[in-house]
Every structure is written in structure tokens, then in C-alpha cells.
């Protein structure tokens, strides 16, 4: 009988130590709901999962960016609607003034309203903003169409680099629409001929505004389609990441119960092994 080294106790102690490590992992998985809580749990799985998490967070932010882009376009369209309504009224007054039954004094009264409406077109252009960004002053105009943009309006609508869309918004000031000279003089309807010319000027302005408004739905439709794709990609990527990283609660609960039983058995065997050497005392009594 050997008493200096209790091999049975050492074996039981070793087994108990590793069993407790398994219990600790089981409890971490059950409490967090994740199978991978540290790199040691599954190094390759963690690497893949982190890449997917990066993509998931990027997709969520891209979806928010997309929504902001739609809001920007809708806001711009609202301001252009106001400007177009004003232009329609100016044209109506020009047609009225071009009629020969009115005196010059009558036309001067009509001119007062026209001048006020031209000023309102300028006011809308200068005050149309989204997050303090001027929208209708040519800031985001298309250089290929004669614009001189001072900034670019990019909607980053993807989770990765270069997944973006540029939007152009033309200049909608009274001068850009031909309603006002560089010196600030507005169109005149003080005579029949001037009123007749004003009709053509306003028609050109309406065409320009209508063209810009017709471009906006194309931008918005694309963003709305992109939003659907982003949500589908987010859903599928999140599901894939979940399969890699999340724990199976039922399976882990069964394993936890098994490890608990084995740990308790190890404790009992360790206690039993520690009493085995007590028999040596009887030999020397």
C-alpha cells in the first residue's frame, strides 16, 4: 500500500478540474446565449462571426443612410412644388397682362404681385435646407449640365466602400430660372409685349423645374429598391451569424446537466480516494 502518492485522488482531482472548466463554459454559454464567448471557444468561428458582425452593422447604418436620402429627396421635391406653384401663378398673371383690355396702370398693379412672387422664388431657393445644407442654390448641381457645384451630395447606401449614389440638384433661384437679371431686376409685364415675352420666360422656368422634379422620383425609386435589398441582406447575414455564434439552449442545457452530474461524481470519488489511505493506519496499530 502506497501512502506518499494517492494516484486515485490525483486522477479524480485532475478530472474534476477539467470538468469544472466545462461547467464554466456551459454557464457562460447559457447566461450569454452565445456559443462563442472568447477566441478559445472557436477561433475560426469567431473570426467569421466578427466579419459578419461588421457587415451587419454596416448594413443597418446603410439602411438608415438610405432613409435619410429618401427624406432629403422628398424635402427637395416639396420645395420644388412650392416654386412650381408660384411659377404657375406668375404665368397666369403674365397671360392676364398680355390681354389688351388692361391699361398700363392695371399692369403696374399686376406687376406688384409678380415682383413679390419672384422674390418668393428667391426666398424659397435660399431657405430650402436639409440639415442646414442649402438645396436649391446650386450647391449640388450637375457640372455636366453647366452647374458649378461647391459640394457633392452622395448617399452611401451600402455596407462597403464605394457603395454610394450621387444626387444632383440644380440651381432654382430666380436668376437661374430667368426670372431676374444679374442686377436683380425681375421680369416685367408693364406692357403687352413684355407680358407676352414673360410668358415664354416662365415657360422655360417651368420646364427647368419640371425636369428637376422628374429626376427626383428616379432617385427615390432607386433608394426604395435599395432599402429592400439592404433589409434582405441584413436578415440573411444576421441569421448566418446567429448560426455560427449563438448557442443551442436545449443542447447546452443537457450538456450542463451532464457536466454537473459528472462534477458531483468526481467530488464523491475524490473524497473516497482520500479515505483509502486511512487503511494504512490499521496496519500499524
Curated annotation (Swiss-Prot):
One of its GO terms (molecular function) is structural molecule activity. GO terms for cellular component: periplasmic flagellum. It holds the Pfam family Flagellin_N. InterPro entries: Flagellin, Flagellin_C, Flagellin_C_sub2, Flagellin_N. Gene3D superfamilies: f41 fragment of flagellin, N-terminal domain, Flagellar export chaperone, C-terminal domain. Its main location: periplasm. Keywords: Bacterial flagellum, Periplasm. The flagellum consists of an outer layer composed of two sheath proteins, flaA1 (44 kDa) and flaA2 (35 kDa) around a core that contains three proteins flaB1 (37 kDa), flaB2 (34 kDa) and flaB3 (32 kDa). PANTHER family: FLAGELLIN. Belongs to the bacterial flagellin family. Component of the core of the flagella. This is Flagellar filament core protein flaB2.
Amino acid at each position: 500500500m502506497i501512502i506518499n502518492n494517492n494516484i486515485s485522488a490525483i486522477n479524480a482531482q485532475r478530472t474534476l478540474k477539467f470538468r469544472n472548466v466545462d461547467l464554466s463554459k456551459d454557464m457562460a454559454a447559457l447566461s450569454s446565449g452565445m456559443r462563442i464567448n472568447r477566441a478559445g471557444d472557436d477561433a475560426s468561428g469567431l473570426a467569421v462571426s466578427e466579419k459578419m458582425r461588421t457587415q451587419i452593422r454596416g448594413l443597418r447604418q446603410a439602411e438608415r443612410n438610405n432613409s435619410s436620402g429618401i427624406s432629403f429627396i422628398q424635402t427637395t421635391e416639396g420645395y420644388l412644388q412650392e416654386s412650381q406653384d408660384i411659377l404657375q401663378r406668375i404665368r397666369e398673371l403674365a397671360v392676364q397682362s398680355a390681354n389688351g383690355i388692361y391699361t398700363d396702370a392695371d399692369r403696374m398693379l399686376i406687376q406688384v404681385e409678380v415682383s413679390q412672387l419672384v422674390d418668393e422664388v428667391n426666398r424659397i431657393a435660399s431657405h430650402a435646407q436639409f440639415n442646414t445644407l442649402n438645396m436649391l442654390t446650386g450647391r449640388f448641381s450637375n457640372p455636366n449640365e453647366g452647374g458649378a457645384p461647391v459640394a457633392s451630395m452622395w448617399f452611401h447606401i451600402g455596407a462597403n466602400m464605394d457603395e454610394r449614389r450621387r444626387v444632383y440638384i440644380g440651381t432654382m433661384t430666380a436668376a437661374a430660372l430667368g426670372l431676374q437679371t444679374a442686377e436683380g431686376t425681375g421680369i416685367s409685364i408693364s406692357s403687352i409685349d413684355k407680358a407676352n415675352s414673360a410668358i415664354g420666360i416662365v415657360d422655360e422656368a417651368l420646364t427647368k423645374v419640371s425636369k428637376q422634379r422628374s429626376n427626383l422620383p428616379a432617385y427615390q425609386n432607386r433608394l426604395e429598391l435599395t432599402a429592400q435589398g439592404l433589409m434582405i441582406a441584413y436578415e440573411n447575414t444576421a441569421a448566418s451569424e446567429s448560426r455560427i455564434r449563438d448557442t443551442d439552449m436545449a443542447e447546452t442545457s443537457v450538456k450542463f446537466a451532464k457536466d454537473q452530474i459528472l462534477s458531483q461524481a468526481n467530488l464523491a470519488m475524490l473524497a473516497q480516494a482520500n479515505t483509502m489511505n486511512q487503511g494504512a493506519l490499521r496496519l500499524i496499530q
